[in-house]
């Protein structure tokens, strides 16, 4: 089984090294094609206004000056000797759940894989802060992902479906179990932080100010809050099928 790894945190991210260790429990044919720099929040963007630069880091390890989507395309269409059987994207530093999946470069890496007809799974690990230090228990994903991925890789999926897996912010022995979930709903809390440069000109940072949300039972939010691993099937078809008839009647 050939496995392609990517992420959005960059080629040198701790989570990517952790994912490679996980992948090597499944296969000896593991390839890494990841962004040269942090691409968090770039979602499913493509680099079409500037060229991509490719750098070989080591055996089967490549850095692309581009987005996670660029990396998957380069891996599948340029770098690997043949199409991978599985694409794994992650392990992201922080959960990718609810509305945040639309911003996520980690999820987008798996999304591009699904577009290419390849079994694709995004993996993310919740974290917490101790003072100003971000503590990401990657050991939780490393301990639990191998057995879970064996099951997920062996499970048939319809075309156009990818899997979004999130691990709770706790130690492996504190995880209660694994559940299949749906996307939850966060309170939109992005805000604009205006500052001034040395010449007095304004510049801006977009910042998260998350409000605590428990989430309804059955959602990814609720699962992580209750120390459960969340597995959410996502689909490429974004059509809101349930209101098509209603719209047709309104336009008749």
Curated annotation (Swiss-Prot):
Lipid biosynthesis among keywords: no
Residues at which a divalent metal cation binds: 8-9, 40, 92
Catalytic activity from the UniProt record: a ribonucleoside 5'-phosphate + H2O = a ribonucleoside + phosphate
Primary location class: cytoplasm
Keywords: Cytoplasm, Hydrolase, Metal-binding, Nucleotide-binding
Family to which the UniProt record says this protein belongs: Belongs to the SurE nucleotidase family.
NCBIfam families in UniProt: PRK00346.1-4, surE
Protein's name in the database: 5'-nucleotidase SurE
Organism: Mesorhizobium japonicum (strain LMG 29417 / CECT 9101 / MAFF 303099)
Gene it is expressed from: surE
């Amino acid at each position: 089984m050939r496995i392609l790894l990517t992420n959005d945190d960059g080629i040198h991210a701790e989570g990517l090294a952790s994912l490679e260790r996980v992948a090597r429990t499944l296969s000896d044919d593991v390839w890494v094609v990841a962004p040269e720099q942090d691409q968090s929040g770039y979602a499913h963007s493509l680099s079409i206004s500037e060229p991509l630069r490719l750098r070989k880091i080591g055996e089967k390890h490549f850095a692309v000056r581009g987005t996670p989507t660029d990396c998957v395309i380069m891996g599948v269409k340029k770098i690997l000797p043949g199409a991978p059987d599985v694409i794994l994207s992650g392990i992201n530093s922080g959960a990718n759940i609810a509305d945040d999946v639309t911003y996520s470069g980690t999820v987008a890496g798996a999304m591009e894989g699904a577009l290419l007809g390849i079994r694709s799974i995004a993996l993310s690990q919740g974290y917490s802060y101790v003072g100003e230090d971000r503590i990401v228990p990657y050991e939780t994903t490393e301990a639990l992902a191998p057995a879970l991925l064996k099951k997920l890789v062996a499970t048939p999926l319809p075309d156009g479906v990818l899997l979004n897996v999130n691990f709770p912010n706790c130690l492996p022995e504190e995880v209660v179990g694994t559940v299949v979930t749906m996307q939850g709903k966060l309170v939109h809390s992005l805000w604009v932080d205006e500052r001034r440069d040395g010449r007095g000109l304004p510049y801006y940072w977009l910042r998260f100010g998350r409000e605590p949300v428990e989430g309804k039972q059955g959602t990814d939010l609720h699962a992580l809050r209750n120390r459960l691993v969340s597995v959410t099937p996502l689909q490429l078809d974004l059509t809101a099928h349930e209101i098509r008839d209603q719209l047709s009647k309104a336009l008749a």
